[in-house]
A protein has these predicted regions:
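Short metal-binding segments enriched for Cys and/or His
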Residues: 81
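Glycine-rich hexapeptide-repeat left-handed beta-helix
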Residues: 1, 7-9, 13, 19-46, ...
Length: 159
């Protein structure tokens, strides 16, 4: 189901049983000063059974498709930047920001207001604490809990 106030650009491919809530903007051109508002041939691909609640923005790719996996839960006011690759079973809590070109592993859980710098990679099974800031230089490994600004390893994630 797509809420009537959501804006879904023609370059968006939705999987089965996807929910998109009020005020979402999915598939808009990337916001980058070098190529502001220029449409591309790249898409936003959203996997099956993904829930995207209100006021979420997901930008189209500039060099590849922006991909959201299956069974993801994206809460209010999240931003996913251009060319991001988000694996299956990822949770993005309110106000999380995923920069352009980021790669997010399976089952990662982002706390409220967490920020992931462009081109950063977050391995599978990680928990990113509320307000944490992940840079492209943050040393990360699978199933870790990372907190702080800049983020650091706190402990193993006990799923």
């Amino acid at each position: 189901m797509v809420h009537p106030s959501a804006v879904i650009f023609p370059n968006v491919i939705l999987g089965d049983n996807v929910y998109i809530g009020a005020g979402c903007i999915i598939g808009a051109p990337a916001e980058h000063k070098a190529f502001w508002d220029e449409p591309t041939d790249y898409k936003v691909v959203i996997g099956d059974n993904t829930i995207i609640t209100g006021n979420v923005t997901i930008d189209a790719g500039t060099v590849r498709d922006t991909v959201i996996g299956s069974n993801c839960f994206i809460m209010k006011s999240v931003h996913v930047g251009h060319d991001a690759l988000i694996s299956d079973n990822v949770t993005l809590s309110p106000h999380a920001i995923i920069g352009g070109h980021c790669e997010i592993g399976e089952g990662v859980n982002f706390g409220m207001g967490s920020i992931i710098h462009q081109r950063a990679k977050v391995p599978k099974g990680c928990m990113i604490g509320m307000g944490a800031v992940i840079t492209k230089n943050t040393d990360m490994w699978e199933n870790g809990v990372f907190v702080g600004n800049p983020a650091y390893f706190l402990r193993a994630n006990k799923k």
